[in-house]
Amino acid sequence: MGKIIGIDLGTTNSCVAVMDGDKPRVIENAEGERTTPSIIAYTNDNETLVGQPAKRQAVTNPKNTLFAIKRLIGRRFEDQEVQRDVAIMPFEITKADNGDAWVSVKGEKMAPPQISAEVLKKMKKTAEDFLGETVTEAVITVPAYFNDAQRQATKDAGRIAGLEVKRIINEPTAAALAYGLDKGKGNQTIAVYDLGGGTFDLSIIEIDEVGGEKTFEVLATNGDTHLGGEDFDNRVINYLVDEFKKEQGVDLRNDPLAMQRLKEAGEKAKIELSSAQQTDVNLPYITADATGPKHLNIKLTRAKLEALVEDLVARSMEPVKVALSDAGLSVSEINDVILVGGQTRMPLVQQKVAEFFGKEPRRDVNPDEAVAIGAAVQGGVLAGDVKDVLLLDVTPLSLGIETMGGVMTTLIEKNTTIPTKKSQVFSTAEDNQSAVTIHVLQGERKQASANKSLGQFNLEGINPAPRGMPQIEVTFDIDADGIIHVSAKDKGTGKEQKITIKASSGLSDEEIQQMVRDAEANAEADRKFEELVQARNQADHLVHSTRKQLAEVGEKLSAEDKAPIESAVNELETAAKGEDKTEIDAKVQALIQVSEKLLQASQQQAQADAGAQQSQSTKGGEDVVDAEFEEVKDK
């Protein structure tokens, strides 16, 4: 059985780990980094760049460089959070035919799972290069507060990337696994505060050890799937734009190129201010008007940054209070606090968390890598490589159906341990009703329309009867991935209807299969592109070495011998600029054939040079005089 890798598919950065023996190991990517920016770029020559190469060219290609796609995954275009992003993202967010939020690149609509799959493919390749074998299975993490649609979409991304997603696990739970695996015996309750690039989660987790087996049980979870480092960056960017407008009278919001430079500079300034008290944001030639070029140079202090984002940090504390209340615990009952996600490096965040819990958070957990490490541990558990670890996760939101009067009737309460199954009997609302519609909802509001609609289906063929008489049993079944299956059964006729909840929109199986085929076709195109680049490199090398030989020994060849070589060199040089690998290969062979005499002349010259060097060293030896010395002793 192959390895099951663990992938932290992050909003800003992603990370991959695997069990190496009995220890989890984070794998470095091709650039030598342990994390990979979750950035995808589509270039003008139809190349797809992922990670650092995509980030490097973002300034010159803002409309086709996609980032923070996780904020769109499994979301509707009309969602309030999506509309906020539409206003600030340099790329185009568009409405799909099914109402989902998609992205438009070069006139082509793309689904977020399709784009996220590019990052997953990079993670898969990173693991394969390290392991030296093909990887087909993975555990992928999601924010604990992701709803069913977002979990489904993440699974779809895995399928498109050619991975069988063995388990979807929650990020804070994964971090707890990473933290608790090597800790000593004893029971403890920990809080995982996970503030990443685009999402925030707080989970209360109990780690118990019974008979050598460690149980990680999630007691409660809460969060905000649209709060993270990107929002902190946007506050900095807006401040810089407003300051520049005050100084220069120019609004940079209409200039995508300038905004992309500002995004990069804003993120860099925010990171610097975690260790420094002040930084300069210096962007020469940010724009120009009739009076000439304009330069941006603004000082940003840590105090100013904290004032800009204070409400965001305060917003993160609300889910903390709710989770503690749901778990039935007081702050004093929390033994340890773990910080996860790059944004938790900000001193203000650490300070507020310490103030709330009355204790300093742990410093021995790497906030960027803990989630991927935990995912790898779970992969090891599923593969049978890691023993004596049991993970008990929860469903983050309540689940139920719409009943008479537009009310949501809850079947499964939030923070219920999964997998779980629950049934309840309902009846008809009208006399002689022959069908019922089961409308599945997720959320905490009593009003059905205020919750997330997960989908609906009909149960037909109910025998005519007075209202309230038929007995319809509705069963909710949540699997270990947090994916929901719902069935409805008429107890009178035995008729049953069941569905696995597909998001009320989401991708159909046909669309996913098409995207898998597209990804495979892209892999073939990538392979051909790599072969073309290798052929070009070989051609360039041959052109260079042939010209060098012509310069060194060309005078020893006749004009008739020299002309076809020069002609073949020029033809190969032209072919190397084209896209046809077959033609490049043919011209390489042609040059090798006509260069035979040049090669002979070059070898003769090399032999002559070697002979001259040998005779020179012999000649040098003739000047040596042999002499005998005798020891003269001092008298």
Swiss-Prot record:
Induction: By stress conditions e.g. heat shock. Residues 600-635 are annotated as: Disordered. The modification Phosphothreonine is found at T199. Keywords: ATP-binding, Chaperone, Nucleotide-binding, Phosphoprotein, Stress response. The keyword ATP-binding applies. Gene3D superfamilies: 1.20.1270.10, 3.30.420.40, Actin, Chain A, domain 4 (3.90.640.10), Substrate Binding Domain Of DNAk, Chain A, domain 1 (2.60.34.10). GO terms for molecular function: ATP binding; ATP-dependent protein folding chaperone; unfolded protein binding. CDD domains: ASKHA_NBD_HSP70_DnaK-like. Residues 600-617 have a biased composition (Low complexity). Belongs to the heat shock protein 70 family. Acts as a chaperone. This is Chaperone protein DnaK. The lineage of its organism: Bacteria, Pseudomonadati, Pseudomonadota, Gammaproteobacteria, Pasteurellales.
